[in-house]
């Protein structure tokens, strides 16, 4: 979504500091007491025994005999091969790796890196599908960016982040960028970080603005966040500044060593920032850029994050897939908002694949000369994995099954009714599969989903918490209560 201007915010008043009396430590303590966290699942003994113990120092797991897609051009792909996970890392990839580790039968599976989402406002998790017919302006800005955002307490941020992060894991997304423009107060920011941490997903926390008011300390509170929660470079959570076009904000990001993630759906807005643009910036949407701006992004080494379903549905403009390809700008996929679209990456891959090909076919029918090549299914799966890791500044750590990288791995069921018999691995992923095919998910070597079930969260408890939070926000926003015609008038 586009950043919200001051005129699009409404003051929220005093922050609710009681929830986080001592920042993230308060949330963690509450979670331990069962007040904020969702209790781990206690599976039956047989199921528990079947879940591999992995991700810890010295723990090894061998994924045996799968179709292995590495996203690493030096390694290539394998019709049948093994992946060895040791601790949090990928130790080896190849056919017939020696035994010596607990073995998981990956036959009938596609083994690949997890998907990487480069822009999602996950604080809105409990508001899924609430604005299905909405435009960006005025609907989203008014109903979500103002009414809902003003109503959120820190605990609502926590629940939204936790729910959306687990939803991402369930869909095979092992890394996401949380574009968190809900920093109404430092407590809200700490709640977002804690929700990400408690989910166990790999994430870039994009510290963004929030509802205007005396407790909003954006962007300066990023210094405290850096010290308190992001002092280590090798943790699951890393820090970015989610911002707009104020050069002073960019300076603060560079001061604390945080990359920049930026909504840009205007025309000409980047020109005053030309000298500040660099490879540490990822630009979102970009449906209306000038030719000069495209050149600036390309020359400065920036990346793109496209949310094509949202851009088409909500009125941002035509997703600039071909402009990115023409300018050789690395691009990636993002879900943006679950208020309108599903949280999976199969939807994202299909939408972008179909849209680019439709546009190229139209140019061919118009007898245009020198028509660009069509995207392939392999292209779009690469964009959804290593392309996302690059746009999230994490491609040295994740996004491919390169030995030495973090073991962010998914196993996709290739013998399921919707894709059997398997004839084309990339085609099955991009065109045939959905979340039901995500059989297992590893994040930093730890099992987060196993045999189709999430591991480490009580889904029923999480649902109850999400419903209570949703009901509170709806009551505060004074929306009608109905699931038939929508909570919001006209939706």
What are these regions (language model features)?
Residues 406-463:
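C-terminal cap of metal-dependent C-N hydrolases
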Residues 128-201, 220-232, 467-469:
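Alpha-helical scaffold segments that flank or form the walls of functional sites
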Residues 321-416, 432:
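His/Asp/Glu-enriched, well-ordered alpha-helical/loop segment
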Residues 52, 182-294:
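Metal-coordinating catalytic core of metallo-dependent amide/deamination hydrolases
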Residues 23, 48-62, 68-113:
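Histidine-rich, glycine-flanked metal-binding segment
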Residues 126-157, 267-280, 300-303, 351-375:
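Active-site gating loops and adjacent loop-to-helix segments of metal-dependent hydrolytic enzymes
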Residues 1-15:
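N-terminal secretory signal peptides
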């Amino acid at each position: 979504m586009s950043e919200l201007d001051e005129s699009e915010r409404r003051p929220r008043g005093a922050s609710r500091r009681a929830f986080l009396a001592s920042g993230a430590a308060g949330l963690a303590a509450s979670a331990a007491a069962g007040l904020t966290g969702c209790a781990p699942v206690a599976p039956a003994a047989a199921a528990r025994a079947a879940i591999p113990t992995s991700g810890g120092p010295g723990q090894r797991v061998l994924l045996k005999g799968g179709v292995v897609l590495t996203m690493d051009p030096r390694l290539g792909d394998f019709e049948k091969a093994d992946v060895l996970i040791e601790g949090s890392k990928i130790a080896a990839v190849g056919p017939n790796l020696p035994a010596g580790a607990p073995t998981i039968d990956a036959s009938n599976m596609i083994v690949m890196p997890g998907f990487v989402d480069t822009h999602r406002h996950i604080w809105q998790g409990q508001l899924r599908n609430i604005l299905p017919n909405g435009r960006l302006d005025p609907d989203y800005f008014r109903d979500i960016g103002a009414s809902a955002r003003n109503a959120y307490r820190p605990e609502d941020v926590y629940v939204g982040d936790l729910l959306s992060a687990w939803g991402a894991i369930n869909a095979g997304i092992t890394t996401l960028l949380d574009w968190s423009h809900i920093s109404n107060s430092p407590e809200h920011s700490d709640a977002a970080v804690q929700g990400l941490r408690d989910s166990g997903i790999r994430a870039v926390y994009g510290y963004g603005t929030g509802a205007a008011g005396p407790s909003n300390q954006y962007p300066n509170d990023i210094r405290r966040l850096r010290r308190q929660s992001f002092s280590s470079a090798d943790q699951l959570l890393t820090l970015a500044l989610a911002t707009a076009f104020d050069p002073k904000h960019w300076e603060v990001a560079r001061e604390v060593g945080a990359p920049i993630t930026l909504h840009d759906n205007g025309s000409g807005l980047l020109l005053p920032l030309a000298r500040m643009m660099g490879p540490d910036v990822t630009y979102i949407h970009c449906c209306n850029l000038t030719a000069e701006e495209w050149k600036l992004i390309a020359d400065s080494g920036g990346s793109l994050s496209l949310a094509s379903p949202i851009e088409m549905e909500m009125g941002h403009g035509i997703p600039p897939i071909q402009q990115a390809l023409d300018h050789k700008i690395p691009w990636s996929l993002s879900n943006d908002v679950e208020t309108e679209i599903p949280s999976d990456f199969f939807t994202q891959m299909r939408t972008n694949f179909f849209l680019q090909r439709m546009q190229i076919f139209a140019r061919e029918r118009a007898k245009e000369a020198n028509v660009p090549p069509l995207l392939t299914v392999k292209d779009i799966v690469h964009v959804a994995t290593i392309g996302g890791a690059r746009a999230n500044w994490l491609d040295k750590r994740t996004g491919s099954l390169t030995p030495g990288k973090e073991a962010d791995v998914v196993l996709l069921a290739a013998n399921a009714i919707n894709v059997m018999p398997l004839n084309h691995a990339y085609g099955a992923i991009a065109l045939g599969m959905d979340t039901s095919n995500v059989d297992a998910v590893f994040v930093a070597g730890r099992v987060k989903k196993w045999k189709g079930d999430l591991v480490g969260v009580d889904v029923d408890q999480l649902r109850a918490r999400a419903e209570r939070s949703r009901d509170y926000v709806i009551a505060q926003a004074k929306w009608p209560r109905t699931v038939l015609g929508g909570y919001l008038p006209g939706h």
